[in-house]
Amino acid sequence: MNSQQCVIIAIAGASASGKSLIAKTIFDELRRDLGTDQIGVINEDAYYRDQSHLSMDERVLTNYDHPKALDHQLLCTHLQLLKSGEAVDIPCYSYTEHTRMAETVKMTPKKVIILEGILLLTDPKLRELMDASVFMDTPLDICFLRRLTRDVAERGRTMESVISQYKKTVRPMFLQFIEPSKQYADIIVPRGGKNRIATDILKTRIQHLLAK
């Protein structure tokens, strides 16, 4: 494998379905073999569009579960640059300010890039760049309870705002966009991010692709 090639694995599914956990598990276990600088994780959330030109009242009304809320074109460009051996500056997104921050995070080319995000499989151009894709098929009620706990504890949200957002956009957009994108996944993973067999299958697939 030359320095200008990389394997891109996408992990999609509902918010709080276990994407981050399985991505972290694969990252932690593969970096021992590949080296920390040879594997990286990119969160689709980093590519939410800049909303600094909007007031806070306008920002909170954005439908963050719709594909248009994300700059997939920039993500595609960054992945193409990484595959060609060039470093990129990944945006940083603030969940409390509902917009991008001024700083970015530099990512250098990697042998393995793990993408994780709710809407990754909805974009045909993104799918073309993936070497393998996964859909976390976790029941929506479990995802909601996890999301409620996480957003209140970690993202400065109120319980009322999380419930309201779930009713207005999260659940409807899951049914309209996210769940239908499951048809494009190579692997469908039940039981969340602690599914050890699914994790091992993914690791084996990555190792096979690296050996080509």
UniProtKB/Swiss-Prot annotation:
Q: Which reaction does it catalyse?
A: uridine + ATP = UMP + ADP + H(+); cytidine + ATP = CMP + ADP + H(+)
> Gene3D superfamilies per the record?
P-loop containing nucleotide triphosphate hydrolases
What's a single GO BP term from this record? Answer: UMP salvage
* Pathway in which this enzyme or protein is active: Pyrimidine metabolism; CTP biosynthesis via salvage pathway; CTP from cytidine: step 1/3; Pyrimidine metabolism; UMP biosynthesis via salvage pathway; UMP from uridine: step 1/1
Which CDD domains has this protein been placed in? UMPK
Q: Name one GO cellular component term.
A: cytoplasm
* Top-level taxon of the source organism: Bacteria
Q: Which UniProt keywords apply?
A: ATP-binding, Cytoplasm, Kinase, Nucleotide-binding, Transferase
The EC number on file is 2.7.1.48
- Which InterPro entries did the record assign? P-loop_NTPase, PRK/URK, Uridine_kinase, Uridine_kinase-like
Q: Where in the cell is it found?
A: Cytoplasm
Q: Which SUPFAM superfamilies match?
A: P-loop containing nucleoside triphosphate hydrolases
What HAMAP family does the entry give?
Answer: Uridine_kinase (MF_00551)
The text of the family note is:
Belongs to the uridine kinase family.
Tell me what this protein is called. Uridine kinase
